[in-house]
Amino acid sequence: MQTRCLPDRHDAGATVRRVRAIHAPVTGAVLAGLVAALALIAPPCASAGSAIGAPASLAIPAENWEVRTRLSDVIFATSREVAAQKPRVLTQETGAARVRFQVQQQDGAVYLVFSNPRGAGYPLDSAGTFIIKRSLADGSFVQVKVFVQDDPGTYLRIFPDGDRTVMDAWLFGEPFQSRVALPVAFDRVLTAPLSSIVEWSAAAVDWSLLLKPSPAPEDRRLQEIAGTLQARLRTLRDMDDGAMDGSGRMVYIATGAPAARGGFNCSGFAKWVVDGLYAPLAGHPMEIGPLKSRNAGRDNPWSTRFEEEMDPWFGLDWTRGLARTLAQEQAGTVPADARVDVRDADHLAYIRDVGYPVQSLQGLLYFLARRDPGKIYLGSVNAPSSAVSEGTPTLRQHHHVIVLLPYFDSDGAFQVVVMERNLRTSIPSLVRRYGSEYVHLVRIDPRGEFDPPPVPGAR
């Protein structure tokens, strides 16, 4: 039996320190399903006067309506006069203290950009930035684009539609809510506070999801765990089929034989992370034997004879075993697979024992972190293997295990820490390597002490 870690596909060069926003593509169908699933447990958005709909209850980005109002003569000037405007930074008393105004021309349109500061600059996609688009040909207003998070794919598009004003909302580059009617003339939007737009649409738009959240204590807990792991990564050794057994020795997973200096493969590394929660409770790391146990109830009859030869379900059984073993130590009972798996099969495109497209992983983690903050996820990456022999159906091979820590930082920005085989990588790195594959997720409850066991021979 061989563990399926595929180290030759591991993108060590993709190591990153921080993932600020979601850039992995999320299909519209999957995103719609995620929204529907989350709506079952999140309160629906209410009217403008309710606790949810009121601007005071939401993390609305810094406002720049004061500067837009001050420059209303420019906004409504002729397109030729607008194009002649020079860039400048203006101060205001409310919202963003400083706002950069500039004009850009492209493809027959002129853009009036009111950028809020972020870091040392004024990026176009900073939260709260308004971009007004006008036609150069006739000066007509085409649309207003408003970024509502520090992410290029999370914004509002507001446009005139006859005598109506209509708004589309986008989240991570995919449609979130479309053709929301606003009860005001389009001209009023041009100088209106974002908080007013939120109020006007509170009954139709789930702003609690579209705007960034306030971090919860569970988010800070995950950030601390990620920091602990990051500090230890450089001391770990890499070794095919390597893991730590129940007595703290470095061994080969397949045989249990001692492994000299030893090291971790992807499966062994994930075990070591979960042992950081298990060992303080049990007094020792997990035993390897039970984690390798195959799920007889999951096997397909035609594939049983290939289990010993190819062990196609290893990553799935291993990650479920880690989740079950920890949960049993925490609660005293062994949970069923359905309790540790991330399924939501009634609303999401979950495939049994396969999971979700890797392409959709970061969007899925965003909603999981909003719905159930503070959880760690183990992923088993899988894809169809080559046919065992002519005329034999292709098997599904679970070949790689990853550790995922999704949380919202102190600024409310979404972060996903990805760790795999002793390295920190990223969601974009996973998508580059496994973009056409699937990942099955199990959840880990990180309550209690976190102290990964010492590794013999660590550097």
Residue ranges and their predicted role:
Residues 11, 16-32:
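Bacterial N-terminal signal peptides that target proteins for export
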Residues 28-42:
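Bacterial N-terminal signal peptides
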Residues 48-459:
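Cysteine-nucleophile amide-bond enzymes
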